[in-house]
C-alpha cells in the first residue's frame, strides 16, 4: 500500500472541536456524549479520576526474564556474557569484551548497550504481559493510558500487537471499568509493526508540496495502526524548524508556516478522518506536537531553551497548530523545552490561556516522555517532584506521560487534598480524557480485530 492564512492570528477565534465549521459533527451525538461524560464524572472517586490522568509505558506491565535484566547482565563476566550473546545469536551485534572491563564490572559508558541487549534478548524470548502487573496498574492505580512499542527495540507482528492491546484493554475494563487508550509514535508510517508501510519523514512529505499525498500517507498510516489495535497517535509533528542544527529537523514541517499549515491539515485529515467526534475503525486520534516553539532552540540542541518575540510566536510558530486545531485535532503534546523562560509543561499562558480559554478548545493536553521530572531535575523551576506535578497540572496539563513511576497519582491526590490543586482542575482534565475516549469510540467498541485490515503492509 503505498485560503490563505492571515499573518496576524486572532486568538479569540473559537475552535472548539464540536463547533468548528471545517469539520463534520452530529450535534445530537455530541450533546449525548457530553451528558454521558458528566454522569460518569459525577460517579467517579478522586482516585479514579486521577488514575485517568496517568499514562504509563508498556514495560510497566510487561513480563521480563529476570536473568536478562540490565542489572543481571551487568554482573556477568566476559565469558558469561559472551555465552549469553552467543546463545541468542547476537554475536554480530554485541561484543562482551567491549562491554565488560577486566575486573568484571561494566563500563558506565556501555549502559545503553546493556539496555539494548536486554531488550533484544527479551524480544527473542517473545513479548509477554504480566497479569499481576496488569491487575496492579488498573485496579490499584486506575491508570487511563498505556504507550510505546512492544518488545523493546524490535517491531512486533500485527497479531502480537492485537493480542497485547486487547489483553491490556480487557484488564482495564475488568479492574477499572473504563477503557484505556493506547498511544504510539507513528511519524512516518507504521514504524513499530513488522511489515508495516514506511514513508519519508515529515520534512520529506512537506517537500512534495502535495496535500493529496500527505492525506494518503495519513490514511495508510491510520489504517495500519488500527490493524494493530492502537487508536491514538502522537502525530503529526507541527513544529516549525528554523534552526538547521536542531537534530529533530527531519520530524518537523520545515520552516514555512503556510506550507506546514496546508500539509499538516491534509496529513491530519488523512489520519483522523472528517469527523473528530466520531473517529471510525479505519482512522486514529491525532496529537499535535510539540506545542509549541520546540523547533527553534537558541543553540540548536534538542530540548534546550528558545527565545522568540511575541509577533513571531503568533505569526509563525503558532500558525500551523492553530490551523490543525481548527480542523479537529483532538489532542496536543507539550513543548519539552523552555520557551521564553518557562518550561512547556508549566506554561499556563500557552496551555490554559491561549489554547483552552481563548480558543475554547475542548481537546486533551498530554506531556511528552518524563517531562514533568525536568521541571525540578533539569530546569530547577520546581523544588521537588510534588511541586513539579502541581505546576504542570495547574498550568493546564490533563494527562501525565510519567511514564515509568507508579507514585504520580498518589502525589497528585495529596496535592488535591492539600488544596494545592483544585478539584475543578481535576474534573476539567478527566472530562477531556473521557471525551477523547468517546471520540475514539472506546466505550462502545473497546477491542480490535486485525482480520478487518486485509490490506495491511
Task: Label each region the model flagged.
Residues 1-27:
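Bacterial Sec-dependent N-terminal signal peptides
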Residues 17-457:
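Glycoside hydrolase catalytic-domain context in secreted enzymes
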Amino acid at each position: 500500500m503505498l485560503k490563505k492564512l492571515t499573518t496576524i492570528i486572532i486568538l479569540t477565534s473559537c475552535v472548539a472541536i464540536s463547533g468548528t465549521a471545517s469539520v463534520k459533527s452530529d450535534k445530537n451525538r455530541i450533546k449525548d456524549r457530553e451528558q454521558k461524560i458528566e454522569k460518569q464524572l459525577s460517579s467517579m472517586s478522586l482516585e479514579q479520576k486521577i488514575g485517568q490522568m496517568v499514562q504509563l509505558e508498556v514495560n510497566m506491565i510487561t513480563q521480563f526474564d529476570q536473568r536478562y535484566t540490565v542489572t543481571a547482565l551487568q554482573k556477568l563476566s566476559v565469558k558469561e556474557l559472551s555465552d549469553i550473546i552467543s546463545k541468542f545469536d547476537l554475536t554480530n551485534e554485541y561484543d562482551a569484551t567491549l562491554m565488560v572491563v577486566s575486573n568484571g564490572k561494566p563500563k558506565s559508558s556501555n549502559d545503553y548497550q546493556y539496555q539494548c541487549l536486554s531488550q533484544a534478548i527479551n524480544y527473542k524470548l517473545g513479548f509477554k504481559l504480566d497479569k499481576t502487573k496488569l491487575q496492579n496498574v488498573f485496579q490499584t492505580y486506575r491508570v487511563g493510558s498505556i504507550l510505546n512499542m512492544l518488545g523493546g527495540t524490535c517491531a512486533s507482528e500485527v497479531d502480537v500487537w492485537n493480542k497485547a492491546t486487547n489483553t491490556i484493554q480487557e484488564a482495564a475494563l475488568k479492574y477499572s471499568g473504563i477503557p484505556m487508550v493506547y498511544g504510539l509514535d507513528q511519524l512516518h508510517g507504521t514504524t513499530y509493526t513488522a511489515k508495516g508501510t514506511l514513508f519519508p519523514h515529515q520534512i520529506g512529505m512537506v517537500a512534495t508540496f502535495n496535500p493529496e499525498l500527505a492525506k494518503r500517507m495519513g490514511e495508510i498510516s491510520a489504517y495500519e495502526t488500527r490493524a494493530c489495535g492502537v487508536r491514538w497517535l502522537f502525530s503529526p509533528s507541527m513544529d516549525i524548524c528554523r534552526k538547521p542544527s536542531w537534530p529533530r529537523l527531519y520530524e518537523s514541517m520545515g520552516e514555512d508556516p503556510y506550507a506546514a499549515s496546508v500539509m499538516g491539515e491534509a496529513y491530519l485529515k488523512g489520519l483522523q478522518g472528517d469527523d473528530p467526534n466520531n473517529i471510525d475503525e479505519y482512522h486514529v486520534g491525532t496529537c499535535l506536537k510539540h506545542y509549541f516553539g520546540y523547533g527553534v532552540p537558541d543553540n540548536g540542541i534538542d530540548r534546550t531553551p528558545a527565545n522568540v518575540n511575541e509577533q513571531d510566536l503568533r505569526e509563525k510558530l503558532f500558525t500551523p497548530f492553530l490551523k490543525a486545531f481548527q480542523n479537529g485535532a483532538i489532542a496536543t503534546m507539550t513543548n519539552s523545552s523552555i520557551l521564553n523562560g518557562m518550561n512547556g509543561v508549566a506554561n499556563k499562558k500557552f496551555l490554559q490561556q491561549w489554547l483552552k480559554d481563548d480558543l475554547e478548545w475542548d481537546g486533551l493536553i498530554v506531556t511528552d516522555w518524563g517531562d514533568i521530572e525536568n521541571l525540578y531535575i533539569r530546569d530547577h523551576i520546581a523544588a521537588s517532584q510534588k511541586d513539579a506535578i502541581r505546576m504542570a497540572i495547574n498550568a493546564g496539563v490533563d494527562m501525565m506521560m510519567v511514564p515509568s513511576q507508579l507514585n504520580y497519582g498518589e502525589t497528585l491526590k495529596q496535592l488535591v487534598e492539600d488544596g494545592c490543586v483544585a478539584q475543578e482542575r481535576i474534573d476539567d482534565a478527566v472530562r477531556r480524557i473521557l471525551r477523547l475516549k468517546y471520540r475514539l469510540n472506546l466505550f462502545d467498541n473497546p477491542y480490535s480485530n486485525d482480520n478487518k485490515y486485509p490490506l495491511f503492509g
